[in-house]
UniProtKB/Swiss-Prot annotation:
Native source organism of the sequence: Geotalea uraniireducens (strain Rf4) (Geobacter uraniireducens)
Quaternary context: Homodimer.
Catalytic activity: IMP + L-aspartate + GTP = N(6)-(1,2-dicarboxyethyl)-AMP + GDP + phosphate + 2 H(+)
Protein name, as recorded: Adenylosuccinate synthetase
Compartment(s): Cytoplasm
A Gene Ontology biological process term: IMP metabolic process
Top-rank lineage group of the source organism: Bacteria
GO CC terms, sorted: cytoplasm
Length: 431
């Protein structure tokens, strides 16, 4: 038996959706443990592209239980829309396989309005929030002002808490942000209607997980965003508001650290980032544009063009360290196929010093310049390759060099967006 955590090893958008989709075949439960609809998983099934923001990728596999844990903040409107769309496409029929933690926190309308207004008023200090209300919802969770799913399902409790919290939120909206306040009735009526649908999926998911673990079932924990966006371990303040690292799989679901056997970090064969913040290997030239165009680097959630750059070994070394990675899934190797030469960042130059580890100080990180080594490209189509041995020699050398620099084995290589365009070197569920 093995239970596996999948985390982003960079700044998000690494291709976790595809890898989770592949690993789901070997799991019984797929569990989402943090974030909200600020993340987007893009899956290509046959000729169809499916984007999921909240519901775990495992929903596309029959007989798999999908759980959204207590660490997630849920926008009911988005959740219901995803269910409706999946059902319309014939991808989801059995309500019983999808469970919501009764303890997860709800994104309220005032969270979204506050989020958008703050970002608009931030000027040069914008962090690049998606405006989905994720940060303000987590603020209220930590500040003990949050409304949980169990509260929403009880009209008396929901009414009491909404009245209690709305006065403060309206003060912030009107007096500090210059925005329109909400009436109690407009929120209460809208969210009470959502509750009627949500109650069909609610469960004590921590208990369900432990029962499944006791029964010997295999669990796959699905993270969102990436290590460098973790609220504690990321490039603060240019981070998300949740624990994106492997430890979040426990706090966000109620699973024990002893239940985790394998931790797989997902990394592109290059690097991308959305929003503001330091990015030493960013390319603002023809190579960067080529990566963006060839890799289709536009956000699944926002549609924003992603910043693109060469592979940064220091970022991956850091992800290996703070997550305890047991393996790396390398994605989008095929995107590099047209490059005559490829660069790898092996260190940083800072004030005439050479750094071989990621600096914790943001001011230092922002001033770091990449130190590169260069490798020849393979300049051939690899999307039809299904074994490591079949890869061009120069592609194999590139993968081996990344593995060496990361200090962690590469256990999967993605050579295209489709599910079958994958080379699995080691199955973590059989470890």
């Amino acid at each position: 038996m093995a239970n596996v955590v999948v985390v982003g090893a960079q700044w998000g958008d690494e291709g976790k959706g595809k890898v989770v989709d592949i690993y789901t075949e070997f799991a019984d439960d797929v569990v989402r443990y943090q974030g909200g609809n600020n993340a987007g998983h893009t899956l290509v099934v046959g000729d169809e592209k499916i984007v999921l923001h909240l519901i775990p990728s495992g929903i596309l596999h029959q007989g798999k239980r999908c759980i959204i844990g207590n660490g997630v903040v849920l926008d009911p409107e988005v959740f219901i829309r995803e269910i409706t769309n999946l059902k319309a496409k014939g991808k989801f029929q059995d309500d019983g396989v999808l469970l919501l933690s009764e303890s997860l926190h709800i994104i309220m309308p005032y969270h979204k309005r506050i989020d958008i207004a703050r970002e608009a008023n931030s000027g040069a200090k914008k962090i690049g929030t998606t405006g989905r209300g994720i940060g303000p919802a987590y603020e209220d969770k930590i500040g003990r002002r949050g409304i949980r799913l169990m509260d929403l399902l009880d009209k008396q409790v929901f009414s009491r808490k909404l009245k209690e919290f709305l006065e403060e939120k309206n003060f912030i909206l009107e007096k500090l942000l210059g925005e329109r306040p909400f009436t109690f009735e407009e929120i209460f009526d809208e969210y009470s209607a959502y509750a009627d649908t949500l109650r069909n999926y609610v469960a004590d998911t921590t208990l369900v997980l432990h029962q499944d673990l006791k029964a010997g079932k295999k669990l796959l924990f699905e993270g969102a965003q990436g290590t460098l966006l973790d609220v504690d371990h990321g490039t603060y303040p240019y981070v998300t508001s949740s624990s994106t690292c492997a430890g979040g799989a426990c706090t966000g679901t109620g699973a024990s650290p002893r239940d985790i056997n394998e931790i797989i970090g997902i990394s592109k064969a290059y690097v991308t980032r959305v929003g503001s913040g330091p990015f030493p290997t960013e390319l603002e030239d023809a190579d960067g544009e080529k990566l963006r165009h060839t890799g289709g680097e536009f956000g699944a959630t926002t549609g924003r063009p992603r910043r693109c750059g060469w592979f940064d070994a220091l970022v991956i070394k850091y992800a290996v360290r703070v997550n305890g990675l047991t393996g790396i899934a390398l994605t989008k190797l095929d995107v590099l196929s047209d490059f005559e030469s490829i660069k790898i960042c092996t260190g940083y130059s800072y004030n005439d010093k050479f750094l071989n580890e990621l600096p914790a100080n943001l001011d230092v990180f922002e001033k770091c310049r990449p130190v590169y080594e260069e490798m020849p490209g393979w300049q051939s189509d690899i999307t039809g390759v299904r074994s490591f041995e079949e890869l061009p020699e120069k592609a194999k050398n590139y993968v081996k060099r990344l593995e060496e620099l990361a200090g962690c084995p590469i256990v999967l290589v993605s050579v295209g967006p489709r599910r079958d365009e994958t080379i699995m070197l080691k199955n973590p569920f059989e470890a």
